[in-house]
């Protein structure tokens, strides 16, 4: 296991596990953490399954805003560009990407969830995307393609908190699972990722990303979040 102060990196048996490790800051994303994640994802070879999870009570609180007042507009733009690079790498990964969340996933943290291929939340998890309050559009298209136009607008305009059950009904997550069951869930995901030859899996992931621009079934169903959420 390669241990960074902010990220634990474990690679074994064609499996890459990235664990956000800033629990004292709700795993908020510093520029350094974003770069370490980008490096880990781009340098890994022959991976069938990538797991992204976090230590502590919360999955990810989004951007680390502790130094925002000292940043120039150029510095802030660079941070957004690098975060979008990370999200694109996750979304277009040539392997299966499993996201395991607990507690709160906010802003860029929720964007990481939406970029993953299979998204699992522990009971009691919540998701919130307040970026448009600040004019930040990161992840908007991915979210819309994932859950549909109406549900995305409900989340983004009203900056609603989506609890796990609501997120599941919207399609933001695929499954609710207790953290005690995550080890078996990872094993199941690994077995599924090994079902195809590596080149076939890579091609499949690439083609389905290209087709991701097709209208979501949830768009056609005009699904909406309950107003009480």
What function would you assign to each model-found segment?
Residues 155-156, 204-208:
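Short alpha-helical scaffolding segments that buttress acidic/His motifs in well-ordered protein cores
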Residues 40, 82-93:
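Catalytic-core regions built around general acid/base machinery
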Residues 1-55:
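Conserved CoA-thioester-binding segment of acyl-CoA-metabolizing enzymes
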Residues 46, 54-86:
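Glycine- (often His-adjacent) and acidic-residue-rich active-site loop
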Residues 7, 88-198:
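Crotonase-fold acyl-CoA enzyme core
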Residues 212-219:
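Conserved small/polar residues in nucleotide/adenosyl-binding loops
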């Amino acid at each position: 296991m390669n241990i960074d102060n902010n990220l634990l990196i474990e690679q074994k048996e064609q499996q890459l596990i990235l664990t956000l490790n800033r629990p004292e800051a709700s795993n908020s994303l510093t520029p350094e953490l974003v770069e370490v994640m980008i490096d880990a994802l781009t340098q890994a070879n022959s991976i069938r399954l990538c797991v992204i999870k976090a230590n502590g009570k919360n999955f990810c609180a989004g951007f680390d805003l502790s130094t925002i007042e000292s940043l120039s507009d150029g510095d802030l733009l660079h941070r957004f560009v690098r975060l979008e690079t990370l999200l694109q790498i996750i979304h277009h990964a040539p392997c299966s990407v499993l996201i395991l969340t607990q507690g709160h996933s906010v802003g860029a943290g929720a964007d990481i969830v939406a970029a993953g291929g299979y998204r699992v939340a522990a009971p009691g998890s919540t998701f919130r995307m307040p970026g448009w309050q600040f004019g930040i559009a990161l992840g908007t298209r991915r979210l819309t393609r994932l859950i549909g136009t109406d549900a995305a607008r409900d989340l983004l305009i009203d900056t609603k908190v989506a609890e796990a059950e609501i997120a599941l009904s919207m399609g933001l997550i695929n499954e609710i699972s207790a953290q005690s069951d995550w080890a078996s869930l990872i094993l199941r995901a690994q077995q599924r990722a090994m079902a195809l030859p590596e080149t076939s899996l890579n091609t499949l992931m690439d083609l389905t990303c290209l087709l991701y621009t097709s209208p979501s079934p949830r768009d056609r169903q005009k699904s909406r979040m309950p107003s009480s959420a």
